[in-house]
Amino acid sequence: MSDWNPSLYLHFAAERSRPAVELLARVPLENIEYIADLGCGPGNSTALLHQRWPAARITGIDSSPAMIAEARSALPDCLFVEADIRNWQPEQALDLIFANASLQWLPDHYELFPHLVSLLSPLGVLAVQMPDNWLEPTHVLMREVAWEQNYPDRGREPLAGVHAYYDILSEAGCEVDIWRTTYYHQMPSHQAIIDWVTATGLRPWLQDLTESEQQHFLTRYHQMLEEQYPLQENGQILLAFPRLFIVARRRE
């Protein structure tokens, strides 16, 4: 599991794209020229940006070669660059930086977010959506299984919190709109939950394990999911998935 799997990620494409659609709807920009899609993945969020601003110069950034290859194939009119978000520098100031479900993987948001604001043009917008599920059973159980089986903690850090992000971005010279939404995804089985998180949150836990160790981990994880996520009357499972949204507009 050394690289991301675009096919597995896109298995829940509609569910993963919905927050991007709702974030994009809150971006208060009309005619703009330069856009960066940070953590563009296979290009599903980039496609939304291209649909809204077809004349804009859009650059998608991702550290995964597989994701970049998939995005280039899907959107030949956009530029895609394999790079680390923290180190990438645009050639010109950006009118919009769009980051859908990517910045949660990076550390030290107290430095990262002001850095991103510095890349914006005056009145430019930083639009961010991050999963806020560190305390949800899906992610708590990952840590519990790892502890039980004596594996090191490889999960991402919790988000800084609403008040922290508001202060960080206000001090960086932005007007800030911030909100949190919990989605309830209908899942047909506990295995479907595993399929969902294997493409994202579970990757760091599994990537350094042998095939046998992965199977041992997933078997125990499945057992614990069954305890935490009861079936609905119709046999479906409701997977609560909170997400944090931020739209920060740089002052002139």
From Swiss-Prot:
Nucleus found in the keyword field: no
Key words of the record: Cytoplasm, Methyltransferase, S-adenosyl-L-methionine, Transferase
GO terms of molecular function: trans-aconitate 2-methyltransferase activity
Catalytic reaction list: trans-aconitate + S-adenosyl-L-methionine = (E)-3-(methoxycarbonyl)pent-2-enedioate + S-adenosyl-L-homocysteine
Gene Ontology CC entries for this record: cytoplasm
Broadest EC class assigned to this enzyme: transferase
Subcellular location: Cytoplasm
GO terms under biological process: methylation
Its EC number(s): 2.1.1.144
Alphabetized InterPro entries for the sequence: Methyltransf_25 (IPR041698), SAM-dependent_MTases_sf (IPR029063), Trans-aconitate_MeTrfase (IPR023506), Trans_acon_MeTrfase_C (IPR023149)
Classification via Pfam families: Methyltransf_25 (PF13649)
Stated family: Belongs to the methyltransferase superfamily. Tam family.
Role this protein plays: Catalyzes the S-adenosylmethionine monomethyl esterification of trans-aconitate.
HAMAP family, per database record: Tran_acon_Me_trans (MF_00560)
Name of the protein this chain belongs to: Trans-aconitate 2-methyltransferase
Organism: Escherichia coli O127:H6 (strain E2348/69 / EPEC)
